[in-house]
Amino acid sequence: MVTKSRKTSDRMLKYLLLKNIKKRKKIMEEQNTPIWWLNDESEQMLNRGYLLKGETVEGAIDRITTAAAKRLYKPELIPAFKEMITKGWISFSSPVWANMGTQRGLPISCFNVHVPDYIEGITHKLGEVIMQTKIGGGTSGYFGELRNRGTAVTDNGKSSGAVSFMKLFDTAMDVVSQGGVRRGAFAAYLDIDHGDIEEFLNIKEIGSPIQNLFMGVCVPDYWMQDMIDGDMDKRKIWAKVLESRQKKGLPYIFFTDNVNRNKPQVYKDKGAVINASNLCSEIMLPSTADESFICCLSSMNLELYDEWKDTNAVKLAIYFLDAVLSEFIDKTEGNYYLQGARNFALRHRALGLGVLGYHSYLQKNMIPFESMEAKMFNAKAFKQIQEQSIIASKELANIYGEPEVLKGYGLRNTTTMAIAPTTSSSAILGQTSPGIEPFASNYYKAGLAKGNFMRKNKYLAKLLEEKGLDNEDVWREIMLNHGSVQHMKELSQTEK
């Protein structure tokens, strides 16, 4: 006679061996552990670099949530963390999927270094960036302190300029991968009033020795106002910036004074200057020679906002991210090239809880992207996330203490929010819309680092099905119209 426990064991073994995603989902539903977002595309994404060898998606979720609860000394939170991810309320960043709760890599997503104007400091920061990339991070650096090309240096020679040193970082990105998951990526930031700005704007041009770097210009108020007022030299440079953005999508534009006017109060009180952003330009934090800013990221799924809005999901997300930060701090102890990042993590504990699925929520509820209703939802959702994340940070400070920078502020984290691009994360989470961006097309091929996938707008498909129009001829017509439905007379203006 086969016992109930033996039957359960055999059934789970059979489940783990099944290759067909539909059969797997059926078994999960029978066991009351559905992961609705786990389809062919999301599973392929995860299996191509985010899971350990032989690990299932469910095993990865167990690994990550158990590690987070352990860092918080709160094992009772494991079921709540699991519910958050299996229901699709939260999306982990790529390094969290790949490295949280493992002996490899680190679970932090982004870093920035402040490159000083002396050779020992430059080479040390290069070492930092290589190590940050190796363990799974996207990186950036501020080069504004480096002297212009041709400036005298102490040995009676002349400086080769900021851009020449960027070549070292460019080469590093060509040979170092992010924890084996993807090629390294680095953004170089330079002030628009730096003497090497025109050389900098030629990065990634045909014939340029620098082809792998991303780039950003830091623009102060005085410079922008002079340009607007008619300074011809500045207008020529601004024209080159705009031309470069049109041709290459770069540089990012970082408005230095605007950022520093709106930085957290603690940084204003302590006179901390924010010079640059991160690789994806969503993080604004201070870096120095001794501290390299980091920010650990994950995102709330706005597509399912109505499911989690009346729960403690945001609080749990902040608790989770603080646990990720604790794992980073523990794992980096004793690592020479990560001490700058570890110093920042210990002293600031900056978090970046963002969102994805914004456009999917609007489409799900038939709300036009530029409507007043969309603006009202935008304000409501982000107000809630901001308020609840601050409450959570205060709770964490009461439980675990304030970090050095926040002594006397009653907070655990200098920042709690950031809007990351989430291209891979949204693909994993049921192909919801990335970040706060709109879908560019209703029918297209998504070319991602982990593969190419054909995408149909699921809410459009549902609408077409209701109208009896969900067929290949209609979709072919949509494809020929570059993914647009504006030509379809069968749809109302609101539906379009």
Question: What annotation goes with each model-predicted range?
Answer:
Residues 3-7, 13-496:
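Extended catalytic cores of very large enzyme megasubunits
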